[in-house]
Amino acid sequence: MLIKDANKIIVSLSKPEKMPGFAYGLPAWECKTGGKLVKVPGSVCFGCYAMKGNYTRFPEIRKSQYKRLDSLKSPLWVEAMATVINSERVSKLKVFRWHDAGDVQDLDHLNKIFEVCKLTPQITHWMPTREAWIKDHLNRCPDNLIIRLSMTMIDQPAAGSWPNTSTVVTTG
């Protein structure tokens, strides 16, 4: 697949300023767990960064996120993502972040991410998530994908049952 054709399918990647590589973002409004937590004071999603600022100031950002979400339905999405990630522009950075905004939508989406990772073995993929059901599928996770469970509440202890976690704390 040509890169230009792959880009038509996946829509675009983002390049978060504070990250060393490219990312693929979806609309935070469609997060399954985060969409509920955004209404809960004390949760890490309360006041979600991806639901304000540039994400709302520039309508084309939100529009692109929804196009990316819709692109997941394409039977060519896995091949297209792998083509773009394997391109020199993206692969030279050696790391890729899934969901600088948004989260895994369902098992089909997770399976597609697994397939993309298998097709891009030279890349270290990083995927933060609040979708705890993914734990049931960690045994199938490719070695080059680090799935980090983000705790749902501020000052919540890390989940000991996950190999990689992240927390938000008010002190320390």
What is each PLM-predicted segment?
Residues 1-172:
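Class I S-adenosyl-L-methionine
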